[in-house]
């Protein structure tokens, strides 16, 4: 049996990142992945502006000024933020300005009003300043032609402000990936319908769908398919038409109605791995058809969810080139004993907080869903190991 890392690496080698781009409104671009480099088409600021409320001056006109020997300048105009008027420079003159307002040509500094007598027709300057003081040059923040953001950037709120400052409203972003879910098994029924004898409700698809949509992944197709080989083929092909990734659940083991291995083979899918060194979820299958990954998971809820968490997010991160989709792996100190020793590597459901990890008290079975409700991670347990309180263990947080 292959190690999980080997299985994942082999699957990633068979698919290519999705490079389709679409344009969305700036108001819809946050949390998307930038599809193109952004190059500034203008200077920021686009005009010389004041960084303070005060008086625009020629710095040399303040030479020698202090509170004992103030310099008096004549006020020849007043500009507020949003005004743009050329007021020619005259020696010994100043223009009243506010923070963000235009500074006319010929003036090269702004004396803050606290260093003056707040004069209205003429102003006394109490401090000598140098050129550039409280003065923002054209392009001081951003130069025209400068690359501002690189393709692949995960856009955050601060990026929205940056794009808006450049006047950009339509933003090129990578198309969101789509993942369809096909739940197989004649025993499955959809929630909201009366449960018939011998049937169970389909729970796995709703866990997976919620997890994906929470991260912005579209799920165009979620359906149940009974154990019928020809119908399974039809449904998988239908999924491939609208999705970049297909997830199936159930039918991957060796029972008479476990049809997925045969169905995938007859469809011409290239099997990348099966029967990895892991419990639960040993019979998980990774395959590729029409250049798209198909991840076939166990029909047991925890087995399906744990292996989904391990494989899917790394696959999604690779296809989108979005590192934020990668899972968080770290180490923690175990609080509870886990005496069960396994021949295979094992994913043990758990709850981690502040560097410590605890185990649920209920039965640890791949078909048991109820004791997952308080879990936020699994322990990645090496084969042949018995866990004791105080042991340091590897964990992977759920997305």
Model region roles, listed by residue range:
Residues 1-8, 22, 26, 48, ...:
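Generic structural signal for well-ordered, non-membrane alpha-helical segments
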Residues 2, 22-27, 31, 36, ...:
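Flexible glycine/proline-rich
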Residues 2, 55-223, 358, 378, ...:
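Short, glycine/charged-enriched hinge/interface segments at domain edges or termini
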Residues 2-66:
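Intrinsically disordered, low-complexity, positively charged segments
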Residues 4-5, 169-297, 301-307:
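Helix-rich terminal scaffold detector
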Residues 9-20, 35-39, 140, 147-154, ...:
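Generic secondary-structure signature for well-ordered alpha-helical cores
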Residues 11, 54, 145, 181, ...:
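Residue-level signal for inorganic ion chemistry
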Residues 48-50, 65-68, 86-90, 103-104, ...:
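Solvent-exposed alpha-helices and their adjacent loops that cap or buttress functional pockets
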């Amino acid at each position: 049996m292959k190690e999980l890392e080997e299985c994942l690496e082999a699957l990633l080698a068979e698919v290519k990142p999705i490079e389709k781009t679409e344009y969305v409104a700036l108001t819809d671009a946050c949390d998307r992945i930038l599809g193109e480099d952004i190059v500034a088409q203008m200077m920021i600021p686009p005009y010389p502006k004041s960084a303070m409320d005060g008086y625009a001056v020629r710095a040399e006109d303040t030479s020698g000024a202090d509170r004992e020997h103030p310099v008096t300048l004549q006020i020849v105009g007043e500009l507020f933020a949003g005004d743009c008027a050329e007021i020619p420079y005259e020696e010994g003159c100043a223009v009243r300005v506010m923070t963000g307002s235009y500074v006319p040509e010929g003036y090269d500094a702004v004396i803050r009003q606290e260093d003056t007598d707040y004069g209205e027709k003429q102003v006394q300057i109490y401090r000598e300043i140098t050129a550039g003081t409280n003065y923002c040059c054209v392009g001081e923040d951003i130069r025209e032609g400068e690359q501002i953001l690189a393709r692949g950037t995960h856009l955050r709120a601060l990026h929205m402000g940056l794009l808006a400052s450049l006047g950009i409203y339509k933003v090129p972003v990578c198309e969101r990936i789509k993942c369809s879910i096909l739940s197989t098994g004649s025993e499955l029924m959809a929630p909201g319908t009366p449960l018939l004898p011998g049937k169970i409700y389909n729970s796995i698809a709703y866990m997976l769908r919620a997890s994906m949509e929470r991260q912005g992944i579209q799920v165009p197709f979620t359906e149940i398919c009974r154990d019928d080989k020809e119908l399974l083929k039809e449904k998988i092909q239908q999924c491939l038409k609208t999705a970049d990734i297909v997830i199936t659940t159930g039918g991957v083991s060796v029972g008479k109605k476990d049809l997925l291995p045969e169905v995938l083979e007859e469809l011409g899918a290239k099997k990348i791995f099966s029967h990895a060194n892991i419990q639960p979820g040993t019979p998980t299958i990774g395959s590729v058809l029409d250049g798209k990954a198909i991840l076939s998971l166990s029909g047991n809820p925890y087995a399906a969810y744990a292996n989904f968490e391990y494989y899917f997010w790394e696959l999604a991160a690779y296809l989108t080139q979005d590192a934020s989709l990668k899972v968080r792996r770290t180490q923690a100190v175990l609080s509870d004993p886990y005496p069960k020793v396994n021949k295979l590597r094992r994913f043990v459901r758990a709850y981690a907080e502040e560097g410590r990890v605890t185990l649920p008290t209920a039965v640890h079975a791949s078909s048991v869903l109820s004791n997952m409700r308080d879990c936020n991670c699994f322990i990645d347990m090496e084969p042949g190991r018995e866990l004791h309180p105080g042991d340091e263990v590897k964990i992977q947080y759920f997305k």
